[in-house]
């Protein structure tokens, strides 16, 4: 359905590259736009905070009732990791998700008519950072966030004293592993569909369409392009997809009485416990950068192409996750989020994956360097200084060529969209 998105341009509709990312499917897991300890949710009878005001109240009430942990450590409302590139994940990205309800397009927002905006230029994000500044001055945001290392950040999470995060699970996961090893599942994190206000919709489950820009192609120096095409053709076939996603029948998977694929408990444990499972078995090893189906897409037999499906995700839930699903009367944690069918799939692919000219990248890098330090300054300054600090950042971004970068990216997006329409 999205094959045309692979076209190079309107003037040159050739396809030089296949996508390295999954086509179609459903999202069964998400970190949400923010994360909150299960213990906090339980104390609030599993009420889900959906706005910043509700989130703030819940944090303040819990800190008032539990100023220290059982280990005697001061409770921290939430913390951030901003000493290196992680600032984009914990300080930058959540602003777009929460304030603008925007999907992940890196440092950019795409407005009406496919016009690009450097996201910190957004009025809504100004208000989001104003809230961050307020949380810092009231002691809810960790006063050490701006000076700590990423290792410090993970250690605080592992201590169980941090009630909330604005992050993604692959980043804070090492801290959670320590908590789980200590049996402190209540101190691990629930994904939340948090937004700035009731009028903003959390975009976590939004399908952004086929990701193009990163992928696999055949070079002009390829000695046997016919063989390469045959290989790609096989990888994309039903047989090829089952082989790379599931492995070998009778070894890595079996068929039930209805002819549907399943894995034994031992195989599932092997796949999750052995970090070299993919290399040893080949299962999942050839997914990236080759084309593959997304989760829940079914083959002609009614089996899913991937091993990740609704049932496997539910079976993997821990005690806290199962209790929450029961309290919410849902099957999946993602059921409390705005669903994918509530959103329109954009005409463009995720912007972060697009190839961009060197001139654009040079300006964009300057913009990010300015925003990195300036946003931290905005957050840690006094509430009275906030607007002046934010205005200075916008002025510095404009002087660094923000308008030129926005125009260049707008032209790239509109050219890509024109190739499809």
Each language-model region and where it sits:
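Hinge/lid segment of periplasmic solute-binding proteins
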Residues: 1-32, 89-128, 132, 180-209, ...
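Second-shell loop/turn segments in exported
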Residues: 43-48, 115-119, 352-361, 375-383, ...
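Short, 15-30-residue, compositionally biased linear elements
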Residues: 100, 119-128, 358-373, 388, ...
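Glycine-rich, aromatic-bearing surface loops/beta-hairpins
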Residues: 211-214
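Conserved small-residue motifs centered on glycine
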Residues: 240-373, 380
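Histidine-centered catalytic/metal-binding microenvironments
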Residues: 373-421
